[in-house]
A protein has these predicted regions:
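Beta-sheet-dominated scaffold domains
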Residues: 1-5, 151, 157, 165, ...
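Disordered, low-complexity "stalk" and linker segments at domain junctions of extracellular
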Residues: 1-154
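Predominantly extracellular/luminal cell-surface or secreted proteins
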Residues: 60-64, 101-105, 161, 169-176, ...
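Secondary-structure junction/capping motif
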Residues: 67-70, 173, 265-267
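Conserved, compact domain cores that house catalytic/ligand-binding motifs in diverse enzymes
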Residues: 146-183
């Protein structure tokens, strides 16, 4: 039961017993199978230094082409009016700018105070913005029983679903950064997301059907994950059950606006589509007149 999705020459492969991988085609006869590293490509600066010790500072690197921010550097202490200096990262993309964060004494949280194009920054007693904090490294698929079993692209994010430890969860990467699961506190609009498809019982996420909204097919029900007219973010996601048929792990087929999937029980093929009269998605039985074709084929 290998889950997969494709973008151009890159196939993303998932299986509940193995770490996620990509299969990339680099030539007509050249293929590369790689384990996905869930971390930003952009690296933080190193060697932070300043004068004094009253405040703690960290710095991140930012790369304009991808909009990706690194995790925070190692911290350095200095006085509030000193100049902070640091060294550009030795590997990864060359940063276009650096973001500087400061932690007030006994606060415990770093807040944004400014950006630098070069490798120095002078703090002129700037009050940190605690609504804007540096990204925190996160890899939800780092261990056995934490490997996802289904995957799909949706709204410039890569969605993963169903580990052995969390069969009813969905994880979405940062926008446009398909190997980046990092988050900030509080979360930002383009941060990675984690959703639990709650129901009266724990139903395993079997597949995704990315349409105008994201349809999540589980072992016991079909759910609509929507954000209205806005892009997915932590503030606007709604999860609504649509029907209670249940699906197998067999990948659904999308034809126009219809989703064809195999029901989890009963040798039934269903077509799920939007029904105007109920303002929801309903799964109709396509095999009702041809039951004989599906006998002993569940």
């Amino acid at each position: 039961e290998i889950g997969y999705t494709q973008s151009a020459d890159v196939l993303t492969l998932v299986h509940r017993g193995n770490a996620p991988r990509t299969l990339g085609r680099t030539g007509h006869t050249s293929w590369t199978l790689s384990t996905i590293t869930f971390a930003p490509e952009t690296q933080p600066p190193t060697g932070l230094s300043g004068t004094g010790s009253a405040y703690s500072y960290v710095v991140t690197s930012f790369y304009d082409d991808t909009g990706e921010e690194s995790v925070a550097s190692a911290a350095a202490n200095m006085d509030e009016t000193s100049t902070l200096s640091f060294t550009a990262p030795a590997s990864g993309p060359v940063p276009d700018r650096y973001y500087v964060y400061k932690m007030k004494p006994a606060n415990g949280l770093y807040g944004f105070i400014g950006e630098a194009v070069g490798t120095t920054f002078t703090d002129s007693t700037i009050i940190p913005d605690l609504e804007d904090t540096p990204p925190q490294a996160r890899n939800p698929f780092a261990a056995t029983d934490d490997y996802p079993s289904t995957v799909a692209y949706y709204q410039q994010r890569l969605a993963f679903g169903a580990t052995n430890n969390d069969p009813d969860k969905v994880w979405l990467t940062q926008i446009g950064r398909f190997n980046n699961m990092n988050v900030s506190v509080p979360q930002k609009a383009d941060d990675a997301l984690t959703l639990r498809i709650s129901s009266n019982e724990v139903n395993r996420v079997q597949n995704f059907a990315p349409l105008d909204s994201l349809i999540v097919l589980t072992s016991g029900a079909e759910h609509l994950v929507t954000s209205g007219d806005s892009a997915f973010s932590v503030d606007n996601i709604k999860i609504k059950p649509q029907d209670y048929r249940g699906s197998t792990a067999l990948k659904p087929i999308i034809l126009g606006g219809d989703i064809l999937f195999v029901q989890g029980q009963g040798n039934v093929v269903r077509s799920m589509s939007y029904a105007l009269e109920s303002d929801s998605y309903r799964a109709q039985d396509l095999s009702i007149l041809s039951r004989h074709l599906f006998v002993n084929n569940s």
